[in-house]
Structure formats: C-alpha cells, structure tokens
Amino acid sequence: MADHTPMMRQYLEIKSGYPDAVLFFRMGDFYEMFLDDALLASRILDITLTSRNKGSGDEIPFCGVPYHSVTPYITKLIENGHKVAICEQVEDPKQTKGIVRREVVRVITPGLLIETENLSPDDNNYLLALHQGAEEQWGVAWLDLSTGEFRVTELAGPGSALAEAVCINPAEVLLADGVRLEEFPADLKEYLAQKIVSRAPAWVYERDYTSSLICDQFGAASPDVLGLEGLPSGLLAAGAALYYLRENRKSAIPHIRDIRVYQRSEHLALDPATRRNLEITASMAEGKKSGSLLGCLDRTVTAMGARRLKQWLGYPLVGLEPIRSRLDAVEELLEGATTRDELAAQMKGIADLERLNGRIGMASASGRDLRALHDSLQRIPPLRELMATMQTALLCQLTKEIDPLEDILDLVGRGIVENPPFSLREGGIIAPGYNPELDELRSISHEGKGFIARLEAQERARTGISSLKIRFNKVFGYSIEITKSNLASVPADYIRRQTLANAERYITEELKNYEEKVLGAEDRIHELEYSLFQEIRERVAGEGSRIACSASGLATLDVLISLAGVADERGYCKPLVDDSQVIDIHDGRHPVIEAMKLGERFVPNDTLLDGGESQILMITGPNMAGKSTYMRQVALITLMAQAGSFVPAASARIGIADRIFTRVGAGDNLSRGQSTFMLEMMEAAGILRNATPKSLIVMDEIGRGTSTFDGVSIAWAVAEYIHDTPTCRSRTLFATHYHELTELAATRERIRNFTVAVREWNDQVIFLRTIVPGGASHSYGIQVARLAGMPADVIERAKEILRNLENGEFEEGAPRIAKSRRQRTPDPSPQFSLFESDEDLLRTRLKKLNIATLTPLEALNLLDELKRMA
C-alpha cells in the first residue's frame, strides 16, 4: 500500500471495510470504482473500463459514472444481486489541504431500497429476517424501509417459515453468520438459493443486545411492552433486521415507529402450492399480475392502495367481525355509485404518501417530494366532505384516520415554491415571503445583476468599444471582455484578469466591489435556502406518525372503492360469512376467467359443501370439461369473501375456512431428485397432516402419476381418510378420472358424486360446463384428442384399441391391441404371455370357490358371472 498515492491508500482502506459491496468512491462530479469493482461494474453497467498508471507495471483498472445520474447504475447492480456502498466527500475540497476526507454514508442492498426509481410502485420491498430457535420455533421478521412497515411473528417448523416467506416475497433474506443452507429442509434450501441472502454477525443474535436495539428504536422500556413476550425467536429475528438496517443506512430511521406482532392464526393459511395454483397474485403461465386474481380485482388509483390490496389477498381474514366490516363498507360504496366515482377522482391525484413519508423521515426527500405531499393533502378536505355521510363502521373510522394535516399543508405551501428544482443546494426552492433575510439577500442579488447591466452600458459609452461585454464564470467571477482589435482603447484603470485567444478580460475596482457583494449574496442565498429547507423537512418529519395514519386510511379506502367498482361492473354479490361449515354458492363463476371475455359465455355453477351430507364432492368428467376451473372458482370465492370482497355469484354463504389446500398438477423437480408422483404424494401428505374440519381442500387427479391400480388405491384411501378422520373431515372437492371412486358414495355417507355434463352429437362431444349430480359414464379422451388436433389416423387407431379394451377382445392369448393392422403376425414365441387366457381365468376363479359357504343367491350370481366369462 505504501507505493500507492494518498487517494488510493484512502480508497483501499475504506474498501477493506466493505468487501462484499461495490464501492462508489466520490471524486468530484463522478463516482469512481477501482480494481475488481471496476472490472465487475464495467461489465454489468456496460461502461468504459480504463486504468490509472497506464503503461506501468502497476496499472489500476477503474471506471466511473456521473454523480447526478447515478441511480440507474445503482439499480442495475442491485438487480444483478450486488450491494453498493456510497462513499462521499464529507469535507469541502476548497477548504481542505491535502486529501479530502471520505466516508461511506450508506450501503444500498436489494432489501433496503428507498429511491422511487428503483422500486415497483405496486409492490412492497421487504427485507426478511429468519431465525431458527429452540424446538423448531422460527422467528420471522420483515420490514419495508421505504414505507416504515415492520412486522414479526413466530412459527412452528421450517414448512411454516417457508410458507410465510413465499407470501412475503422478500427482496432480500437475512440469516445469521454460520447458518448453513445445507442444514435446512430441501424445499426451504431451494427457496433461499433463489434469493439474495445476506448475513448478520452471530453475536447480534443475543437477547440482551437485540432487546436494547428494539427498545431504543421504539422508545419502550421492555420488548414485552411491544407484545414480544413469549416470542424469543421472533425477538432475535426483529433485532437482527434492525441491526442490519442501522449498519447499512448509517443514519436514523425515525419513520419506523412501531412493530406489529401478528399471529398466523389471524389469517387464512395458504401454503406455497395453493398460492401458486390459485394464481392469487401472479399467473402460473407468465408469473405476472395479469391473469391473476389480483390483476382481476385491482382498480386502485394509488400505489398505496395497490400494495394494500395485494396484502389483503395474501392474508385473508378468519375473524367474522373484520370480514363483515369490510363487506359492509364495500356494500355502501357499491350502492353509492356517484359518491364512489367522486371519491376515486379525488384519490387519483394523491401521491405515494407511505414512501414520501419514509423519505422525509430519512432526510432524503427533495423539494419536489414535499410539494407532492402538499398537493396530495389538498385533496383530503373535499374527500372527507364526501365521506361525511358514510354510515358503516369502517368508513366512519377511515374518515377519522384520514387527517387533513392543515398545519403541514400550510407550512409546505408557504415554504416551498410550486415547481422546485431538483437540486437542493443551488437555490430557487424556498418561496418568496417565507423568510425576511432570504428576501433581502435576493433583492441584493437582483439589484447587483441590474448594476452589472448598467455598468456594461456605461463602459461601452466611456471606452467607445461597442463589442465590450461583462462576462461571468465560476472560476474567475465577473470580468470585462475586450476583443484584441480594441485593446488600444482599454482605459488605464482596467486590471488584466485573463488572456484568451481572441480577447483579454479585465476587472475594475467598481466591478470587483459589486462582484463581492453579489456573489456573497448568491452563496449566502444557497446556504440559507438549504438550511430553511432542512428545517421545513424536519418539522414535517416530526408529524410522520400522522402522515402514516392518513396514508394507511387512504390506502384502505382505495381498496374498498376498487372492490366496490369491480363488484358493480361484474354483478358480484355480498357473501354471507359465518362460522359454520357450509359453503353454499348459487351460480358461482371463476372471477379471472369470466373477466377475460374469451368469446363464450361463462357457465355458472352451484356448490354445496358442509360438514353433514355433502362433505366431499367426488367430481368426474372428461378433460377440458371444466372440473379444474370449477374447483378453483370455489376456492377463490371463499378466499375473496374472507378478504372482504364481494364474490362472482348470484348468492353465497361462506363458512369461514382456516386453510385452503390445493393439490393439482405438478412437474418433475429433477434438481431435487423428485418425480411428479413424489411431489404429488408429498403435497397430499402435507394436506392430510394439516387439514382440519374448518379447512377447504381441492384435490385434482390424485394418484394419476403411477399405475392405474396404485392410483385408484391411493385416491380411494385419501378420500376415505378425509371422510373418516375426525381431526381432518374437511370440506373437499375431489376430481378424478378413476370412475371406481364414485362407488365411495355408496359406502361413505358424506360423499356425493357430481360430474360435468356432456352432450354427444354426430360423433362430436360438446362440453356443457355444468356440474350435475351423478358419475361420468365416459372419459371422452379420444374426443379431446381430436379437439387438440391429433392426426386422424391416430384418432381412428385409438378408437379401434378402445373397442378392443372395452370388449375384452383377445387373440392368441394376447389383447388385440398388441397387433397393428399394418404388422405381420409374429411367429409363435416360447415366451409366456403377460396376459392370462380366458380359460386360465376361469380355472383360477373356480379354484378359489368355497362351495360350502355360498348361499343360493350367491351361487346363482356366481354362475351368471362365470357364464359371461366363458
């Protein structure tokens, strides 16, 4: 290091403290990167890589980006999974001898973003901290630095922790140093391998230390005051998240004002497979919002509302009162369409107050941010006036929560100009009339500039040089510029200041005196404006809790307006939600498919599930007939009702579910050595272990990934278990291709058979999409193959084979399907047939008879059976 320049020694010393981050090292108007950071950044950012000490034996690779346009470069590095450490000059170079002091002012990580340009407005940006405690208790803490949201809970087992992580969908996961992913269960390990995982020192996970961090942040005497008693793992996870936040922000985070302790039992439980299969927030086809339930219901007009709706669908409720409160509010807004439209119009102009409040609290808000806050607050009084006549409890509560913040509105309105500049340090941000001293300095500056114009005219007249001009630049200040052709006319009192190629620049005592006065005023204006802006921003930050309350109320109102608008447009009904085991839906529809308008009328269907006669609906019918759509729509209607939404049906009674499980199609997971069938069995086992009489199960084609007999046996046993086991006994939709399972309805009192109605016409099959009582008589697989565009030859051959199988036709000891019309009959082979001949079957059946135990009726039936076999 001794061979390096002082600047490079400073760089290397600072870089040693941040080995896992790309160091953006401020050099004047640029952030520069050196050595390995430069090699990495130049490749990812596609910027020029050069080097210092070119041609020598110790070339130092480096590259740089302009400080005023740094955000997109940071964004690209973050998107590629890298952290960025911002190292600023913390001294004025003009007032420093030697090397300028520099410090890392913050470290930007994927989970700690606050800049609007880096964030999706509709999605939260969570940092998730996980900690495995004693007895498989997992602490789960998650926060969004951009909004100030902070939550913590404790869950039993890695499966529950994984389910919660999938729901949260964090940008970054925090674990303790020394925790090895290889020690986690395969599914959790696989999930974390796809995430950006950061580490906190092991010593952070010590109760006294984390307790002190949490108490200091929230001003509490003890963590117990915050509801963290009895959550030892949750406390450590929350403390680690705070530690990581403070270490990387390098500044106070006052906008994180409270921590919410929640219990998972407060919400409808949805495991990762169910969230994926029901396409709640993202479609399975493209992984996007479009085509999901969220995309179908989202008519919100604010970023806050969009995020709140996503939370409601991700965390449906199980408490009757809060569900009914939401439904009542949606109903009132639905019935008052005119008021609803006026409310939505007012909401459209409201900025993202949650994230504005976060930036204000962290002292990173600009003048434009404060003005956006002001313009948003202006919309609250007319909005509250529209809400004044609301009757339902939730809407009345929201009216109180949405604070117009008149004092903040007045402060920002008086203090900040309507169109503030981007920069905070170059003036023009504070409104005239706000500060007398600033007004006086501006007057001096303005008069000084007028003096310059008058002086220029005066000197032209005095010297007779018509081309004389008074110029200004930041290095030399003001000067009188004379072209070289006019140098003979320069007065004796002119003092040369600068020589140019075609001119000379001069200064006079009079100009110098006014320069000092004007430039001094300009510098003072910039300093004073920045100081006044900081003062205004700090006063606004002091009211952050009120801003947060208003923002939350506005977000909820936006969601309710959105749900009411969708319900009005699509003819949704208000569900009756109770604590029974009944799910009774009349003319239910699939909300997403119905909204897609695919060119055919969506066929509604009824559903009745209960804990009595209709606990399990055994649903048979051909592929493409609509079984999966029907079952998913029942699950989605249940979820929507518990989220507080109206539902796509003529009427609906929904007995609250504690969990929704779905077991539908899966693909091989070869990276974990798991086949489709293994995944199917694992998901089914998880359902049987965790389901309760309050749960809703959707089982689609269980057992199809193995042989027919094995599949039938497994599906049969699973259905019996759900029916017979008192601790399970869930309401269940059970779709199957195994027609044998319809026999269960004869032996199990709470199983009912249903099928999808089909009409055959001219050798064609027409799917009526209607669910009717009874079992399917045909699978219609060949007709589906024809619809899929299978070649005609294949279709005809399939028909022939099907007739062979249905008629039990054999030839020379083998089924007729073993031979093709195009094949020559092979020579007899000494190898035994895999199929028994009819004669062998008869002989085997007779040998097993016990004539002594047969009744006369059984003997007659048996004789008839043997005759049919002969």
Swiss-Prot record:
* A single cellular component GO annotation: cytosol
**PROSITE patterns on file:** DNA_MISMATCH_REPAIR_2 (PS00486)
Region named Disordered: 813-834
A GO molecular function annotation here is: ATP-dependent DNA damage sensor activity
Against SMART domains, the record matches this protein to: MUTSac (SM00534), MUTSd (SM00533)
Q: Which CDD domains does this entry report, sorted A to Z?
A: ABC_MutS1 (cd03284)
**Which keywords are on file for this protein?**
ATP-binding, DNA damage, DNA repair, DNA-binding, Nucleotide-binding
Q: Give the Pfam families listed for this entry.
A: MutS_I (PF01624), MutS_II (PF05188), MutS_III (PF05192), MutS_IV (PF05190), MutS_V (PF00488)
GO aspect biological process, one term: mismatch repair
Superkingdom:
Bacteria
Annotated ATP binding lies at G621, P622, N623, M624, A625, G626, K627, S628
Q: Does the keyword DNA-binding apply?
A: yes
Q: What does this protein do?
A: This protein is involved in the repair of mismatches in DNA. It is possible that it carries out the mismatch recognition step. This protein has a weak ATPase activity.
PANTHER family named among the record's database cross-references: DNA MISMATCH REPAIR PROTEIN MSH1, MITOCHONDRIAL, DNA MISMATCH REPAIR PROTEIN MUTS FAMILY MEMBER
The protein's matches in HAMAP family, at most eight in alphabetical order, are given as: MutS (MF_00096)
The family this protein is said to belong to: Belongs to the DNA mismatch repair MutS family.
Name of protein: DNA mismatch repair protein MutS
Provenance organism: Pelobacter propionicus (strain DSM 2379 / NBRC 103807 / OttBd1)
